[in-house]
Amino acid sequence: MISDLNLDNYNYSLENNRIAKYPKSKRDDSKLLVCKEGKLINQKFYNIDKNIPSDSSVFFNNSKVINARLIFKNRNNTKIEILVINLFNKNYKNLLFNKKKVIVETMIKNIKKWKENETIEKANNDITLKVKQLNNNKVIFTWNKNKTWLEILEIFGKIPLPPYLKRDSLPEDLINYQTIYSKDQGSIASPTAGLHFTKSLINKMNKNFLIDFITLHIGIGTFKPVTTKNINRHNMHSEVISFNKKNLINIYNSNNITAVGTTSMRFLESIYLIGQMINEKYKNLNIEKFLYNKMSNKLTKKESMEEIINYMEKNKLNIMNLNTSIFILPGYNFKMCDQLITNFHYPKSTLILLIAAFIGEDWKKLYKFAIKNNYRFLSYGDSSLLFKK
């Protein structure tokens, strides 16, 4: 069992001038800090393939960010900002393909200026989008044309940049804040470790490594701060993961795994738990934040993949969609990942806790070195390659 942790032990001083508000002009020209067995090496990201073990398989999260930020004005011309934070229903159906109306969970800025029964709207040519509050942060959007919710968001929405960038999105963010391999619509934040990859770099890696694309649709938990004194009580929002048998076979055949980003890591560690749950006859395969504390975790990686493959064949499933709320804290026993490619994260965040779980106290040395050597931080910042300690 993971004991209570003091969040203050996962703090560091991050000055505003360290936060990269804009990306590098060339994606792979960012700095790369390699951390292996406590040793730190300055590199460039375009050389990352030379630093990953030759027998490693590399897993990328291909979820695509949608224009989830919408700005309306009420009757008094006051700005109301709405961030759509849930794009799936309880059966994992993607709501982006709804037509005429959709009910979604949101975060609302300036909500006190929006009367409960007031419908606010905006128009674009002959399309009118209306929205009204329901309850529990849910709203109903309706529109007058036979278009999908995705099409409506592309017309009216903006790319949801993280609040710590403290700027409005620009047209170029529509490209810069997506990975070049993004495919499956459904995230409200980018899997930013992947932003450094160019087409030529991926082509080069494809010749030297087994690479595969998995899906975890990123939700509000990515930038939701930890506000509880007891870290264990932090509410981890669930996120939808999607995978097929090919993904499982590739994991099965991998003796060494590199996760591109914390979301890929959370996907991979969640997949292991699904196999363990099937083995232990769980009926509900959704993953609670500390499920790993309740399980025997006795299966090997290969045995876990076999359990899921057999389950999919038995139930004639080509794809599985599930929710994960896995919360990785220091003391966690990693079952899947050997290396992690990741940016530099916000102090006292769930992502810092994950890094500390993966490389132990070396995270402090890593961040101290990065600050001293003028690394750029957060979503548009530089990157690191971490070897499990």
Where in this protein do the model-derived segments appear?
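Surface-exposed, charge/polar-rich loops and edge strands
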Residues: 1-389
